[in-house]
C-alpha cells in the first residue's frame, strides 16, 4: 500500500513539474505561451579554447584557432594560450602553415576582426622571456576575471 501511495505521489509531482513549464498567459486578448525559464531566457553560451601547443604541433594550433573563428559566428569565444602557445602570439612570432588550414597570421587577424578575446598566460610569458609589450596587437595578458565574464551562458572548454 505504501509503495502504491509513493508511486502515485511521484507521478503527481512529475506531472506538476511538467505542466509548470508550459503555461499560457492571456493579456489583452493575446495568448502567449510561456515556456520553462531556460527557454525564455536563453543566454549565449561561451567557448573557451585552451591552447598549450606551439610550433611543434601546427595541426593542433591551427585547428583550435579555426574552431575559434567558426564558433565566434554565434557563440562568445575566448582563446587562452599558455605553455608553448604563448610563443605564437608575440610580435616576433613566425607565421605557421599546415596543409589546408589558413595560416596562423590569417586566423589571428580573423579573430581580431571578430573582436574575440585572445589572452596569453603571464607566468608562461615570463618563463619564456616575454613581456606584455612583446604581444601582437589585440592579444592581451590573461586576467582571471575574464575567464568567467566573457559570456553570460554556459562555458564549454576545448583543449588543444
Where are these regions (language model features)?
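Positively charged n-region of N-terminal signal peptides that target proteins for export
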Residues: 1-4
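C-terminal motif of bacterial Sec signal peptides marking the signal peptidase cleavage site
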Residues: 13-16
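Bacterial Sec signal peptide processing site at the extreme N-terminus
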Residues: 18-29
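Short, glycine-rich nucleotide/cofactor-binding loops
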Residues: 42, 49-62, 89-93
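Histidine-anchored nucleotide/phosphate-binding helix
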Residues: 60-75
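Short internal beta-strands
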Residues: 68, 77-84, 118-122
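A glycine-rich helix N-cap at a beta->alpha junction
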Residues: 95-124
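C-terminal partner/receptor-binding element of secreted or periplasmic proteins
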Residues: 137-160
Amino acid at each position: 500500500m505504501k509503495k502504491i501511495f509513493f508511486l502515485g505521489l511521484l507521478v503527481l509531482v512529475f506531472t506538476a513539474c511538467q505542466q509548470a513549464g508550459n503555461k499560457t498567459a492571456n493579456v489583452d486578448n493575446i495568448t502567449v505561451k510561456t515556456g520553462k525559464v531556460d527557454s525564455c531566457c536563453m543566454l549565449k553560451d561561451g567557448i573557451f579554447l585552451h591552447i598549450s601547443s606551439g610550433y611543434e604541433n601546427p595541426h593542433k594550433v591551427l585547428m583550435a584557432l579555426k574552431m575559434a573563428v567558426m564558433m565566434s559566428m554565434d557563440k562568445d569565444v575566448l582563446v587562452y594560450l599558455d605553455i608553448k602557445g604563448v610563443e605564437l602570439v608575440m610580435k616576433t612570432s613566425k607565421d605557421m602553415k599546415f596543409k589546408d588550414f589558413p595560416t596562423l597570421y590569417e586566423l589571428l587577424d580573423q579573430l581580431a576582426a571578430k573582436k574575440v578575446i585572445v589572452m596569453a598566460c603571464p607566468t608562461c610569458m615570463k618563463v619564456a622571456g616575454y613581456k606584455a609589450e612583446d604581444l601582437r596587437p589585440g592579444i592581451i595578458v590573461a586576467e582571471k576575471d575574464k575567464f568567467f565574464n566573457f559570456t553570460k551562458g554556459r562555458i564549454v572548454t576545448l583543449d588543444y
